[in-house]
Amino acid sequence: LDTYYGLKEGRISRADFAPTVYLFGAKAAPGYVRAKGIIKYINELAELVNGDADVNGLMQVVFVQNYNVSYAEKIIPAADVSEQISTAGTEASGTSNMKFMLNGAVTLGTLDGANIEIAEQAGAENEYIFGARADEIARLQKDGYDPNAVLAAEPRAKRVVESLVDGTFSDGGTGMFRELYVSLTEGASWHKPDHYFLMRDFIEYCDAGCQPGLSRRAGFRGKVCAQCGKRRRVFVRPYDSGICAGHLARVNAWDKAKRHGAKVPCRFFMPSASARAWCG
């Protein structure tokens, strides 16, 4: 939503922004009301963005229902950027980021879980790292943290959060969006306000997320190759260089297609697994 506003208002350069399709894939347990609220919000956002002729040539949003292995087998090999955005110190590890990395995807994420090892092996300069580190999160938990102070200081964050309750989107009268809003600003159940420190990382996350979409394609190729080199060091699979060549071929094809006016790349986001990918 912040990117949508940025494009609409000129804060994000349309000339530098790569046309992007955001694919969200998730599923919610029958009684998981908050997860259902997030999915509803994604679909409302899709309706807003896709129905706006002013921006839908630059960005679109699609929700993939019941995301599963069959979808992953198609999406993961195509990914250019894998988002792994769990709050630092909250996720022991995961395998999604490894699967994306094994297919040449650059990681955009926090220093958490296996992201740390990926950054160490491929080089932090070849990833898009943002957000508070685990020691800062621990300090905020100890000394106190006020997300409302962050919202007061960051109009962009406030505008996005307020969209939950200001009429921008409708939850059909279920109250799910207000529950999400309350969880961020007042606290819900046994959690304090913004339990996962989302507002602390919000602006850094949005700004980091725009970097892969800028017109620095040559630099991005180098980052992709670094992921492939990491695979050879860790797994000793000599044929991985062929995968890298195929991935770079997709990047080159994207460049050629873009020169001819094609609208090609897409991003994939799994909220339940804290992962998003930008597919070319």
What are these regions (language model features)?
Residues 1-5, 43, 47, 80, ...:
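Amphipathic, well-packed alpha-helical segments that form the structural scaffold of globular domains
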Residues 77-79, 85-256:
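Catalytic binding pocket for nucleotide-activated donors in carbohydrate/polymer assembly enzymes
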Residues 272-274:
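Serine residues within intrinsically disordered or low-complexity segments
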